């Protein structure tokens, strides 16, 4: 199942890391808005005026307010290959 999460986790992590506002549409048509505070295999914690725990199986669509860069952010251990 790790293969199926190879797109989902970096996408949600970029939303969380960059604090990108999102609209989450549930399968019943309800629209939730806020920022992804955290997530795991089963839920997303969405923060607005209150925090809401949203089960992933109830989510239809996640719409970011702007473009999302899922490329990994270079860390302090990454070295340039100028040599």
Swiss-Prot record:
Pfam families assigned to the protein according to its UniProt record, in alphabetical order: Hfq (PF17209)
Role: RNA chaperone that binds small regulatory RNA (sRNAs) and mRNAs to facilitate mRNA translational regulation in response to envelope stress, environmental stress and changes in metabolite concentrations. Also binds with high specificity to tRNAs.
A cellular component annotation (GO) from this entry: cytosol
InterPro entries xrefs: Hfq, LSM_dom_sf, Sm
Residues in Sm domain copies: 9-68
PANTHER family in the cross-refs: RNA-BINDING PROTEIN HFQ
GO BP, sorted A to Z: regulation of DNA-templated transcription; regulation of RNA stability; regulation of translation, ncRNA-mediated
Keyword 4Fe-4S: no
Keyword terms: RNA-binding, Stress response
Protein name: RNA-binding protein Hfq
Keyword RNA-binding found: yes
MF term (GO), any: RNA binding
Family, per entry: Belongs to the Hfq family.
Superkingdom assignment: Bacteria
Subunit structure of this chain's protein: Homohexamer.
